[in-house]
């Protein structure tokens, strides 16, 4: 774009590494796709396109092309101009949001460790760089960027597959103003993996924040929080893994504290957050021993520090960990009894408290970020979905089941929108198309989430949890039996002795049902809630706001039902946006650069459906748009379509495509949409559009400079002031302002222009407040033309195809001559009453002086007499009679108040307006550098002369009496009281908390291999076994019989909207010949009038 020289990390002088867009591959097979990705990966090109879909391969190293130079390179550039990059996709989202006024979202998918979180960071960073804004906007940008290290510290952890694995899902909405400035945001978080707080698998870590705190805390913090080395804590030493390659926990701790500061968390609350994290670590070191079948705390000394950090009594903590209060009902009476727990139950209670504390702390941090970015109303947004990837471990439990279910839903969205919906659209629009087969994973989603006929796995699980009385393995075995009965015959389900198998789109996964029911119940006992509500720290009490006094009614919600609802809500949110896709691929399990595992990549290529995606994109169309939206976006390309096309929408689209010389085989016309085949053709349209805007921007600049130089409204402003002189107080901030006229920008508002006459000039247009019979304020648009006053409102359509949409409605149209007068107060308020024949209008506008002055001028021109103006502090206006309700009058009384803002008080049929004193009634505007002499206003739009007509004819070859001259169209457009223990617990006490022993089988790493593809893989192979013939091109239209035609002898530029423009030698189809000399014809799909003496018949 432009002549500016571009530099890039991929120079055009070096060898081409594979193909940038895999639609161009000569062979479409999984082998060819994987080979192209490998070639580019080995040459350090990690991004590749499939049409508009971006494929990203995790390089496991920092790449050099994410600097400010690349941001400048991709900003505003078309996709084809530069090599594939995540910045190109982000820029496309950002520009489409502003141009099409539509919310956008990007769905980042891939298995764990494929690079999804890093991709989300680059998207946020790019948007922060390219969007403008002042100090407030910069603050929002800082929060958006700093939310990443904070949420990663508390929500990410090292797993076997990924050193920085997201153990929660998030959907980050960046909200924008209409000018494209990020001025707000919102985070939705899903399914934090709470179990990781109390248990980790081998070679994994707990959440990053624990290790950051232990490494980065100051000496004072270590003393106050009783911090030791990680191997001292039971909640950290089970996996015997404390360090991560390439991770500096001490440095990251500083970033986490800085992020909390930016987000607005006060230092005192930051200290309490860290105190809570340390308290959870110390809580985990409380162990239990058996004492006559009951649990007893093994070392009472270990109670002191967690109780101190949590602000609770150590005796109550011991009591709640080893006993539980249970309510029983007998004969209509209820009583509470204390039940002593055994060792297993006590350990479960301790872990439940730790998980509950951490989960509520995480929710607090997310809410703190949302509060810092909150804005009163939503305008535009870009959503970034960064959610846990599909994962398979040696032992897969309830968390993996939920994670893989959400990924299954995301795969379904991709199938619905890129494979299924696209092909169905071609059929509906009448585009010739040969269907392409693919595996639809909806059958797997139904297996998991169906409610009835047959019930899905989640429904069976909820049913077992609602009726279970046994705990532990008893309920889990009941679940397994019921699953076998409900879905045992499903082709994507198998059961085994300790669990079940689901044939996911990404392969077969074996789930161990042990703990499924307990984790699905997700209940925090009321004893523990009561315990935390006794904390001396208000912050901790705030995390437990439950009211436990009332009776509990209804079945409590389960973790499974929550994640199912969240997943479906997420899908609904994504479907309301224009989606973009990033498909992340993990090249190896070693996490090393340039290590390529062919089988692993081919498996991902297959289950991600890349081959089918390429085939649909290759045989299909890169771009499709409804006729009306296409015309709206590209209307500026031709004079005939700007500001709007007045003929048939289909013909308007064809006219635009012909105007840019697009080849007919590059597009097809559907019944309601235009389909453009290649991206290059679309880029052509965008380039021409930008050049047009550039030219018009220069014209606007010239007009603005001329406006500033002339200051033509100085005299008009003084005339308006004379109307109110010695009659009404003036406002200080408005007496010297310039008059603009059109404050609504009617040139760009066809929905408002439709109520005006075809050539009706606009003197004034503004959004005002109208007060009804009950003095209820309603927004209206007030438009003044030389003949009429228009009041336009908005209503929701109740019938028809546009049902539910809000449309503009003409509420009132009053002829200037029908006005009886205008009433105003003597104070500095903005109210006025338009007195009419039927009923009056009580309005409020900050530009009342400008409106009243123009209204007086137009009234005098139409009636040859001045408009009656009334100035009084007691006014009345008549209201329209409705039904049985009386019409009558309403009174408005103005009184002296305080300040410049009016205070309204309604009492029956009277409104009292109080406002402070303004400038004296004798105030006049100050003349600032007005040019001498009255500025001249053009009364007619400029015209372009046509070639000289034949002798005896007037301009444009028409007798002077044949047609009237063009009418003017003139639109003015603007602009603790507990004492701490004497020291940290001794190391000897912690020595009893040794890592748990592991059976030899747990060291098996076969789960890291590429998973068995299962039934989903077999169905994919069956569905794509035969390659269909790609859809044929656009059928050749039948030749149309021609009527009489003529050839242009001279160039003619139309002087009105119903006239044709043409160049020399263009052939026009004659529709009608009129004796007046004006003929009617058709050219480029548009009909209009033209002078007959400018053409010759052929």
UniProtKB/Swiss-Prot annotation:
Q: Which positions bind ATP?
A: 110-117
Question: Which Gene3D superfamilies does this UniProt record tie to the protein?
Answer: 1.10.10.820, 1.20.5.4820, 1.20.58.530, Kinesin motor domain (3.40.850.10), Myosin VI head, motor domain, U50 subdomain (1.20.120.720), SH3 Domains (2.30.30.40)
Compositional bias segments (type: Basic residues) = 924-937
User: Where in the numbering of this chain does the IQ domain appear?
Assistant: 693-722
* A family per Pfam: SH3_1
Region (Actin-binding), start-end ranges: 579-589
- What is this protein's record name? Unconventional myosin-If
UniProt source species: Homo sapiens (Human)
């Amino acid at each position: 774009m432009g002549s500016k020289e571009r530099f890039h990390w991929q120079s055009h002088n070096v060898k081409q590494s594979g193909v940038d867009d895999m639609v161009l591959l000569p062979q479409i097979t999984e082998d060819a796709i994987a080979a192209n990705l490998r070639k580019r990966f080995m040459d350090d090109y990690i991004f590749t396109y499939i049409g508009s879909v971006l494929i990203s391969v995790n390089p496991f190293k920092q790449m050099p092309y994410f600097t400010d130079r690349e941001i400048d390179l991709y900003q505003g550039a078309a996709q084809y101009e530069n090599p594939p990059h995540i910045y190109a996709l982000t820029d496309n989202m950002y520009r489409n949001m502003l141009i099409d006024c539509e919310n956008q979202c990007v769905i980042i998918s891939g298995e764990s460790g494929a690079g999804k979180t890093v991709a989300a960071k680059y998207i946020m960073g790019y948007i922060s760089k390219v969007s403008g804004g002042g100090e407030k906007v910069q603050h929002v940008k800082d929060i958006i960027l700093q939310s990443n290290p904070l949420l990663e510290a508390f929500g990410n952890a090292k797993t076997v597959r990924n050193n920085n694995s997201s153990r929660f899902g998030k959907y980050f909405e960046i909200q924008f103003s209409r000018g494209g400035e990020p001025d707000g945001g919102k985070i939705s978080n899903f399914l934090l993996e709470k179990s990781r707080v109390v248990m980790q698998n081998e070679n994994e870590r707990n959440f990053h924040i624990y290790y950051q705190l232990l490494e980065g805390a100051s000496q004072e913090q270590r003393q106050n929080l009783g911090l030791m080395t990680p191997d001292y804590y039971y909640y950290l030493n089970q996996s015997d893994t404390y360090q991560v390659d390439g991770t500096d926990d001490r440095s990251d701790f500083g970033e986490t504290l800085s992020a909390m500061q930016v987000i607005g968390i006060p230092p005192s609350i930051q200290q309490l957050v860290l105190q809570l994290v340390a308290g959870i670590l110390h809580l985990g070191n409380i162990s239990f021993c058996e004492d006559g079948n009951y649990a007893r705390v093994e070392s009472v000394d270990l109670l002191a520090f967690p109780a101190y950090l949590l602000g609770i009594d150590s005796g109550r903590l011991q009591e709640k960990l080893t006993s539980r209060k249970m309510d029983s009902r007998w004969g209509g009476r209820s009583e509470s009894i204390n039940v002593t727990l055994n060792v297993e139950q006590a350990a479960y209670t301790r872990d439940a408290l730790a998980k509950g504390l951490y989960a509520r702390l995480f929710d607090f941090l997310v809410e703190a970020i949302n509060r810092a970015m909150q804005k009163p109303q939503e305008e535009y947004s870009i959503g970034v979905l960064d959610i846990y990837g599909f994962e398979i471990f040696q032992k897969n439990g309830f968390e993996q089941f939920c994670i893989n279910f959400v990924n299954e839903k995301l795969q379904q969205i991709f199938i619905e929108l890129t494979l299924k919906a696209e092909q169905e659209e071609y059929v509906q629009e009448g585009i010739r198309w040969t269907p392409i087969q693919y595996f639809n994973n909806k059958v797997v989603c139904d297996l998991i989430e169906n409610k009835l006929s047959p019930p899905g796995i989640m429904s069976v699980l909820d049913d077992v949890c609602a009726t279970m009385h046994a705990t532990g393995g008893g309920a889990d075995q009941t679940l397994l039996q019921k699953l076998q009965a409900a879905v045992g015959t499903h082709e994507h389900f198998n059961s085994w002795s300790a669990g079940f198998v689901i044939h996911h789109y990404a392969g077969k996964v074996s789930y161990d049902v042990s703990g499924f029911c307990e984790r699905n119940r997700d209940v925090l006992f009321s004893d523990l809630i009561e315990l935390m509500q006794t904390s001396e720290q208000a912050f901790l009490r705030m995390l437990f706001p439950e009211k436990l006094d009332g009776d509990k009614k209804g079945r409590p919600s389960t973790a499974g039902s929550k994640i199912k609802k969240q997943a479906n809500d997420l899908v609904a949110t994504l479907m309301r946006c224009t989606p973009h896709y990033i498909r992340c691929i993990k090249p190896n399990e070693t996490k090393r650069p340039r290590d390529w595992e062919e089988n692993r990549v081919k498996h991902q290529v297959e289950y991600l459906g890349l081959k089918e995606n390429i085939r649909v994109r290759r045989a299909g169309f890169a771009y499709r748009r409804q006729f009306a939206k296409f015309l709206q976006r590209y209307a500026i390309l031709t004079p005939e379509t700007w500001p709007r096309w007045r003929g048939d929408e289909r013909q308007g689209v064809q006219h635009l495509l012909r105007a840019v010389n697009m080849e007919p085989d590059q597009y097809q016309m559907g019944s309601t949409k235009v389909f453009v085949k290649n991206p290059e053709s679309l880029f052509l349209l965008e380039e021409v559009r930008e050049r047009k805007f550039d030219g018009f921007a220069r014209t606007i600049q010239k007009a603005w400079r001329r406006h500033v130089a002339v200051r033509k409204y100085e005299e008009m402003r003084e005339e308006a002031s004379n109307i109110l002189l010695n009659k009404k107080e003036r406002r200080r901030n408005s007496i010297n302002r310039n008059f603009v006229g059109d404050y609504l920008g009617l040139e760009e508002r066809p929905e408002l222009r439709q109520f005006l006459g075809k050539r009706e000039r606009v003197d004034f247009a503004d959004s005002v407040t109208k007060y009804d019979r009950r003095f209820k304020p309603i927004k209206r648009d007030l438009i003044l033309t030389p003949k009429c006053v228009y009041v336009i409102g908005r209503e929701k359509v109740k019938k028809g195809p546009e049902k539910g949409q809000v449309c503009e409605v003409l509420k009132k149209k009053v002829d200037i001559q029908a006005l009886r007068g205008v009433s105003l107060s003597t104070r500095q308020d903005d109210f006025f009453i338009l007195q009419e024949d039927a009923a009056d209008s009580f309005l409020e506008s900050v530009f009342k002086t400008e409106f009243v002055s123009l209204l007086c001028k137009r009234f005098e021109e139409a009636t040859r007499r001045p408009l009656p103006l009334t100035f009084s502090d007691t006014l009345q206006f008549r209201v329209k009679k409705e039904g049985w309700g009386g019409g009558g009058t309403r009174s408005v009384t103005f009184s002296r108040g305080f300040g410049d803002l009016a205070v309204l008080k309604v009492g029956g049929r009277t409104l009292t307006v109080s406002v402070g004193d303004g400038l004296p009634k004798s105030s006049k505007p100050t003349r600032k550098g007005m040019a001498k002499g009255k500025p001249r206003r053009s009364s007619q739009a400029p015209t372009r002369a046509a070639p000289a007509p034949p002798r005896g004819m007037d301009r444009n070859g028409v007798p002077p009496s044949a047609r009237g001259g063009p009418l003017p169209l003139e639109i003015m457009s603007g602009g603790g009281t507990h004492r701490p223990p004497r020291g940290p617990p001794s190391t000897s006490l912690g020595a009893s908390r040794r890592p748990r022993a592991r059976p030899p089988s747990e060291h098996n790493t076969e789960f890291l291999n590429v998973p068995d593809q299962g039934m989903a893989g077999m169905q994919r192979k069956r569905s794509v076994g035969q390659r269909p013939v790609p859809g044929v091109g656009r059928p050749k239209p039948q030749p149309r019989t021609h009527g009489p035609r003529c050839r242009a002898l001279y160039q003619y530029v139309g002087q009105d909207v119903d006239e044709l423009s043409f160049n020399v030698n263009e052939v026009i189809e004659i529709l009608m010949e009129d004796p007046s000399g004006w003929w009617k014809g058709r050219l480029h799909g548009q009909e209009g009038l033209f002078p007959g003496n400018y053409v010759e018949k052929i």
